[in-house]
Amino acid sequence: MGLDIVVMERKAVRCPHCGEVINTVDIASTDSGGRLWYDFLERLGYYVPYEKRTEKNDWYGKDMVLDNEQAKQLTDYAMQKEVYNWGGVERVVTEALAHGNKVVINADW
């Protein structure tokens, strides 16, 4: 089984009265995949080899919200390595950052 990754733009929905985040909405997403992603996801702390996996660092199939710097690194990596659908990854990340939204990844392998 190969690695599949979804890159999403996620917007926070805030309460009009207090401004607290009450929900989130996924605005856009794109799919990618392939073994080239393992290196980036391992450096990010998302992918941990099975032997080193604990309950605390097991992100398999879970959403990880990236900060702006990590999101930029994601785009740079996708473009440099020319991963599958790197243009879609660049588009989702660029739009998310332009709109002040979060970039979220979810992968399984």
Spans of model-derived segments:
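Acidic (Asp/Glu-rich) sequence patches and key acidic residues
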Residues: 1-109
